[in-house]
Protein backbone atom coordinates (compact mmCIF):
# COMPACT_ATOMS: atom_id res chain seq x y z
CA UNK A 1 0.00 0.00 0.00
CA UNK A 2 1.54 3.24 -1.20
CA UNK A 3 0.46 5.32 1.80
CA UNK A 4 2.22 2.94 4.18
CA UNK A 5 5.35 2.77 2.01
CA UNK A 6 5.58 6.55 1.62
CA UNK A 7 5.10 7.09 5.35
CA UNK A 8 7.66 4.42 6.22
CA UNK A 9 10.21 5.78 3.74
CA UNK A 10 9.83 9.31 5.13
CA UNK A 11 10.19 8.03 8.70
CA UNK A 12 13.35 6.04 7.86
CA UNK A 13 14.88 9.01 6.05
CA UNK A 14 14.26 11.30 9.03
CA UNK A 15 15.63 8.68 11.44
CA UNK A 16 18.85 8.39 9.43
CA UNK A 17 19.26 12.17 9.32
CA UNK A 18 18.70 12.50 13.07
CA UNK A 19 21.23 9.74 13.79
CA UNK A 20 23.77 11.47 11.55
CA UNK A 21 23.42 14.69 13.57
CA UNK A 22 24.19 12.68 16.73
CA UNK A 23 20.67 12.72 18.21
CA UNK A 24 20.20 9.81 20.67
CA UNK A 25 18.77 6.79 18.85
CA UNK A 26 15.71 6.55 21.09
CA UNK A 27 14.83 10.21 20.48
CA UNK A 28 15.29 9.78 16.74
CA UNK A 29 13.09 6.69 16.81
CA UNK A 30 10.31 8.54 18.65
CA UNK A 31 10.40 11.37 16.11
CA UNK A 32 10.39 8.89 13.21
CA UNK A 33 7.43 6.95 14.64
CA UNK A 34 5.48 10.17 15.21
CA UNK A 35 6.21 11.24 11.63
CA UNK A 36 5.14 7.84 10.28
CA UNK A 37 1.83 7.93 12.18
CA UNK A 38 1.02 11.53 11.32
CA UNK A 39 1.91 11.24 7.64
CA UNK A 40 0.02 7.96 7.27
CA UNK A 41 -3.13 9.46 8.81
CA UNK A 42 -2.87 12.51 6.53
CA UNK A 43 -2.36 10.47 3.35
CA UNK A 44 -5.15 8.07 4.36
CA UNK A 45 -7.59 10.94 4.83
CA UNK A 46 -6.70 12.40 1.44
CA UNK A 47 -7.19 9.03 -0.25
CA UNK A 48 -10.45 8.22 1.55
CA UNK A 49 -11.85 11.67 0.76
CA UNK A 50 -11.43 10.89 -2.95
CA UNK A 51 -12.93 7.42 -2.53
CA UNK A 52 -15.92 8.66 -0.53
CA UNK A 53 -16.64 11.33 -3.16
CA UNK A 54 -16.85 8.60 -5.81
CA UNK A 55 -19.02 6.39 -3.59
CA UNK A 56 -21.37 9.31 -2.95
CA UNK A 57 -21.69 9.97 -6.69
CA UNK A 58 -22.30 6.26 -7.34
CA UNK A 59 -24.97 6.28 -4.61
CA UNK A 60 -26.83 9.07 -6.37
CA UNK A 61 -26.65 7.12 -9.63
CA UNK A 62 -28.09 4.07 -7.88
CA UNK A 63 -30.99 6.16 -6.59
CA UNK A 64 -31.58 7.27 -10.16
CA UNK A 65 -31.56 3.63 -11.37
CA UNK A 66 -28.34 4.26 -13.34
CA UNK A 67 -26.80 0.98 -12.25
CA UNK A 68 -24.19 0.54 -14.97
CA UNK A 69 -22.89 4.08 -14.46
CA UNK A 70 -22.58 3.47 -10.71
CA UNK A 71 -20.67 0.25 -11.33
CA UNK A 72 -18.27 1.99 -13.73
CA UNK A 73 -17.57 4.70 -11.17
CA UNK A 74 -16.90 2.19 -8.40
CA UNK A 75 -14.63 0.14 -10.66
CA UNK A 76 -12.70 3.29 -11.52
CA UNK A 77 -12.18 3.92 -7.79
CA UNK A 78 -10.42 0.55 -7.44
CA UNK A 79 -7.21 2.32 -8.49
CA UNK A 80 -7.07 3.77 -4.97
CA UNK A 81 -6.77 0.27 -3.56
CA UNK A 82 -3.03 0.48 -4.23
CA UNK A 83 -2.87 3.47 -1.95
CA UNK A 84 -5.01 2.56 1.04
CA UNK A 85 -5.61 -0.69 2.89
CA UNK A 86 -9.17 -2.14 2.83
CA UNK A 87 -10.33 0.15 0.00
CA UNK A 88 -10.46 -2.69 -2.53
CA UNK A 89 -12.51 -4.86 -0.18
CA UNK A 90 -15.05 -2.11 0.45
CA UNK A 91 -15.40 -1.23 -3.24
CA UNK A 92 -15.61 -4.87 -4.33
CA UNK A 93 -18.38 -5.32 -1.75
CA UNK A 94 -20.38 -2.47 -3.26
CA UNK A 95 -19.89 -3.62 -6.85
CA UNK A 96 -20.77 -7.22 -6.01
CA UNK A 97 -23.90 -6.16 -4.14
CA UNK A 98 -25.14 -4.07 -7.07
CA UNK A 99 -24.69 -6.96 -9.49
CA UNK A 100 -26.35 -9.34 -7.02
CA UNK A 101 -29.37 -7.11 -6.46
CA UNK A 102 -29.73 -6.92 -10.26
CA UNK A 103 -29.77 -10.75 -10.22
CA UNK A 104 -26.56 -10.79 -12.26
CA UNK A 105 -25.12 -13.48 -10.02
CA UNK A 106 -22.31 -14.58 -12.34
CA UNK A 107 -20.81 -11.08 -12.40
CA UNK A 108 -21.52 -10.53 -8.71
CA UNK A 109 -19.63 -13.61 -7.53
CA UNK A 110 -15.99 -12.61 -8.27
CA UNK A 111 -16.50 -9.22 -6.60
CA UNK A 112 -18.27 -10.69 -3.58
CA UNK A 113 -15.37 -13.14 -3.18
CA UNK A 114 -13.12 -10.11 -2.58
CA UNK A 115 -15.54 -8.39 -0.20
CA UNK A 116 -14.55 -6.70 3.05
CA UNK A 117 -15.51 -9.18 5.77
CA UNK A 118 -17.20 -6.50 7.88
CA UNK A 119 -19.70 -5.78 5.11
CA UNK A 120 -22.11 -8.42 6.40
CA UNK A 121 -24.67 -7.99 3.61
CA UNK A 122 -22.04 -8.66 0.93
CA UNK A 123 -20.73 -11.63 2.91
CA UNK A 124 -24.27 -12.96 3.21
CA UNK A 125 -24.72 -12.71 -0.55
CA UNK A 126 -21.41 -14.53 -1.09
CA UNK A 127 -22.50 -17.31 1.27
CA UNK A 128 -25.76 -17.69 -0.66
CA UNK A 129 -23.78 -17.94 -3.91
CA UNK A 130 -21.79 -20.80 -2.38
CA UNK A 131 -25.02 -22.45 -1.22
CA UNK A 132 -26.49 -22.29 -4.71
CA UNK A 133 -23.27 -23.79 -6.08
CA UNK A 134 -23.60 -26.73 -3.66
CA UNK A 135 -20.52 -25.64 -1.68
CA UNK A 136 -21.86 -25.91 1.84
CA UNK A 137 -18.45 -25.89 3.55
CA UNK A 138 -17.56 -22.56 1.93
CA UNK A 139 -21.01 -21.21 2.74
CA UNK A 140 -20.54 -22.04 6.42
CA UNK A 141 -17.00 -20.62 6.47
CA UNK A 142 -18.24 -17.39 4.90
CA UNK A 143 -21.09 -17.01 7.39
CA UNK A 144 -18.72 -17.73 10.28
CA UNK A 145 -16.40 -14.99 9.06
CA UNK A 146 -19.35 -12.62 8.65
CA UNK A 147 -20.80 -13.16 12.14
CA UNK A 148 -17.33 -12.73 13.60
CA UNK A 149 -17.07 -9.31 11.95
CA UNK A 150 -20.70 -8.27 12.56
CA UNK A 151 -21.99 -10.19 15.61
CA UNK A 152 -24.80 -7.73 16.39
CA UNK A 153 -26.76 -8.11 13.13
CA UNK A 154 -29.99 -10.00 13.76
CA UNK A 155 -30.74 -10.54 10.07
CA UNK A 156 -27.29 -12.04 9.50
CA UNK A 157 -27.82 -14.70 12.18
CA UNK A 158 -31.31 -15.43 10.86
CA UNK A 159 -29.97 -15.61 7.30
CA UNK A 160 -27.27 -18.03 8.43
CA UNK A 161 -29.88 -20.26 10.05
CA UNK A 162 -32.17 -20.00 7.02
CA UNK A 163 -29.44 -21.19 4.65
CA UNK A 164 -28.43 -24.04 6.97
CA UNK A 165 -32.07 -25.11 7.15
CA UNK A 166 -32.34 -24.93 3.36
CA UNK A 167 -29.33 -27.26 3.20
CA UNK A 168 -31.25 -29.72 5.38
CA UNK A 169 -29.21 -29.10 8.53
CA UNK A 170 -31.89 -28.03 11.00
CA UNK A 171 -29.71 -28.86 14.01
CA UNK A 172 -26.97 -26.48 12.88
CA UNK A 173 -29.61 -23.88 12.04
CA UNK A 174 -30.86 -24.00 15.64
CA UNK A 175 -27.30 -23.70 16.90
CA UNK A 176 -26.75 -20.60 14.75
CA UNK A 177 -29.84 -18.96 16.23
CA UNK A 178 -28.74 -19.89 19.74
CA UNK A 179 -25.33 -18.33 19.10
CA UNK A 180 -27.08 -15.24 17.77
CA UNK A 181 -29.13 -14.96 20.95
CA UNK A 182 -25.94 -15.02 23.00
CA UNK A 183 -24.77 -11.96 21.07
CA UNK A 184 -28.23 -10.36 20.97
CA UNK A 185 -30.07 -11.46 24.14
CA UNK A 186 -33.82 -11.04 23.87
CA UNK A 187 -33.86 -10.42 20.10
CA UNK A 188 -37.48 -11.07 19.10
CA UNK A 189 -36.81 -12.36 15.58
CA UNK A 190 -34.07 -14.75 16.69
CA UNK A 191 -36.30 -16.10 19.47
CA UNK A 192 -39.30 -16.49 17.16
CA UNK A 193 -37.35 -18.35 14.48
CA UNK A 194 -35.68 -20.62 17.03
CA UNK A 195 -39.14 -21.53 18.35
CA UNK A 196 -40.34 -22.09 14.77
CA UNK A 197 -37.55 -24.58 14.09
CA UNK A 198 -38.10 -26.33 17.42
CA UNK A 199 -41.77 -26.77 16.45
CA UNK A 200 -40.92 -27.98 12.95
CA UNK A 201 -42.13 -24.79 11.29
CA UNK A 202 -40.52 -22.62 8.62
CA UNK A 203 -38.43 -19.59 9.50
CA UNK A 204 -40.21 -16.26 9.15
CA UNK A 205 -38.00 -13.71 7.41
CA UNK A 206 -40.37 -11.21 5.83
CA UNK A 207 -40.47 -9.03 8.93
CA UNK A 208 -37.01 -7.81 7.87
CA UNK A 209 -38.62 -6.23 4.80
CA UNK A 210 -36.45 -5.05 1.92
CA UNK A 211 -33.28 -6.04 3.77
CA UNK A 212 -34.44 -9.65 3.48
CA UNK A 213 -35.74 -9.44 -0.07
CA UNK A 214 -32.40 -8.11 -1.36
CA UNK A 215 -30.95 -11.60 -0.90
CA UNK A 216 -33.33 -13.02 -3.54
CA UNK A 217 -34.14 -16.19 -1.62
CA UNK A 218 -37.83 -15.99 -2.45
CA UNK A 219 -39.47 -16.21 -5.85
CA UNK A 220 -40.58 -13.05 -7.61
CA UNK A 221 -44.18 -14.26 -7.31
CA UNK A 222 -43.83 -14.54 -3.51
CA UNK A 223 -42.27 -11.09 -3.28
CA UNK A 224 -45.00 -9.54 -5.43
CA UNK A 225 -47.67 -11.25 -3.33
CA UNK A 226 -46.09 -9.84 -0.15
CA UNK A 227 -45.87 -6.36 -1.68
CA UNK A 228 -49.51 -6.47 -2.79
CA UNK A 229 -50.60 -7.58 0.70
CA UNK A 230 -48.59 -4.75 2.26
CA UNK A 231 -50.12 -2.29 -0.19
CA UNK A 232 -53.60 -3.56 0.67
CA UNK A 233 -52.88 -3.10 4.37
CA UNK A 234 -51.77 0.49 3.79
CA UNK A 235 -54.93 1.21 1.77
CA UNK A 236 -57.12 -0.18 4.57
CA UNK A 237 -55.37 1.99 7.14
CA UNK A 238 -55.91 5.07 4.99
CA UNK A 239 -59.60 4.22 4.65
CA UNK A 240 -59.94 3.90 8.44
CA UNK A 241 -58.20 7.24 8.95
CA UNK A 242 -60.52 8.98 6.48
CA UNK A 243 -63.59 7.64 8.27
Q: Each PLM stretch: what is its role?
A:
Residues 172-243:
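Long, non-transmembrane cytosolic or organellar matrix-exposed soluble domains/tails
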Residues 148-186:
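Compact, basic/aliphatic-enriched, mixed alpha/beta core segments that act as assembly/interaction modules
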Residues 1-50, 222-243:
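Helical anchoring/docking segments at protein termini
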Residues 24-30, 36-106, 111:
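N-terminal topogenic membrane-targeting module
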Residues 51, 57-59, 89, 95-96, ...:
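Conserved small-residue packing positions in alpha-helical repeats and bundles
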Amino acid sequence: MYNILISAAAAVAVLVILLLVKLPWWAGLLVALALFGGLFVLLSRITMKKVMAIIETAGKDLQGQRFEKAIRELKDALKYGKWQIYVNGQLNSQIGMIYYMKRDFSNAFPYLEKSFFKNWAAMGMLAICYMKRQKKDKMVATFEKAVMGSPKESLLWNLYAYCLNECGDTTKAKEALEKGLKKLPGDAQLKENLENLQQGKKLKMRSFGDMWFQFHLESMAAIQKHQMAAMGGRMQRRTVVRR
